Structures are given as structure tokens and as C-alpha cells.
Amino acid sequence: MNAILDGFRRLADFKGRDRRSRFWPYALTVVGLSFVGLWLGMIPAMTAIFEQASAVAATHPEAATVISGPGHYSVEIHDEAFMPDMGPFFLVLRIGVAAIVILLAAAVTRRLHDTGRAGYWGLPPVIFLTICLTAFPTVMARLMAEEGPDMSLFMLLFLNNFLYIASLIGLIILLSLGSKTTANRYGPPAI
């Protein structure tokens, strides 16, 4: 519990070192709470999207196809003018991701310092994730609006997401490495 509270107290402390036993309880708590928060934030955003799609199907049946069955209900909208507003969904997603990055930035930096690495090693996943969250709405809007869409942007986004996952796995490996037992340029060994 002390490791978790210490992580929250040191949100803006990018100096020094943190052992694995201090970092992981805090990081997993932040990720867990963030997923719960994102889930709770997504409920109203997704509900609004479903309500908009159902309203289009009811008022403009020529612009939508409804398929329903036991445990299944879907609405496919054929006219771009009637597409639900995805803005709130992406806003909640962006706020949630920003919160995770802010809450973990200093702790990741201190953990990397403990392994003898600069905090900059934590940036590649953030960069690739930012590209995805910025480009995804535009790419999806283009794919849904075009007859025979240009898939090159989608493939670039797919490559970006692959690089994000690879860089995230690499960062997790770095964060899992053992501590340097001697003092390094970031300070004495963490207690």
C-alpha cells in the first residue's frame, strides 16, 4: 500500500530511482483504475452512439439496415450524413489515455533510472499511441465515407499500431529488469 501511495505523492518527481517492488504495485493500480474509469466514461458515450443509430434506423429506414436476433442487434448506416457522432467516444478515450500517461510518467522515469536508463526510453509508446489517437478518427471517417476506400492510410495506421505494441512490450521488458545495485548518474540505489 505504501508503494501505491508513494507513487501518487511523487507524480511530478522525475528524479531519483524506484525499485520494481515500488513501481509495479503503483503502475498496476493506475492501469486498473484507469480501465475502470474508461469503462465508466465509455458507457454514456457508447449509449449515445447506439441511440443515434437506432433513431436513424427508425426515422430513415432507407438509410440503415437493422439486423437483430437472440442476443444480437446491429444497425448499419449507409448514408454518411446520418452517421452517429463519434466525438464523445474519442474524447473519453483521449482523456483516459492522457490520465494514464500523466499518472505513470514520473514513475516510469524513476524505474528506468533504477536500471541505468534515461526516462526518454518511455516516450516511444506515448508517441505511437498519440499518433493513433489523432489519426484513427480521420482514417475511419474516410474509410466509411468512400466507395472503394484508399487503404493506404489504414495500412499506415496499422503499421503505427504494430510499432506501438512493439515499443510497449520493449518498455515493459526494460521496466522489469533488475535494479543497478550501485549508484548511477540518477542517484544511489532506491531503498
Task: Locate the predicted segments by residue.
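Hydrophobic alpha-helical transmembrane segments in multi-pass membrane proteins
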Residues: 30, 34-38, 122, 134
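Hydrophobic core positions of alpha-helical segments in small-molecule transporters
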Residues: 26-29, 123-125, 162
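Membrane-interface extramembranous regions at the lipid-water interface
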Residues: 1-33, 106-119, 173-191
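Hydrophobic alpha-helical transmembrane segments
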Residues: 25-31, 91-104
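Central hydrophobic cores of alpha-helical transmembrane segments
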Residues: 120-130
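Membrane-helix exit/interface motif
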Residues: 40-44, 100-110
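Terminal transmembrane helical module of multi-pass membrane proteins
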Residues: 149-191
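Membrane-helix interface segments in multi-pass membrane proteins
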Residues: 37-97, 128-167
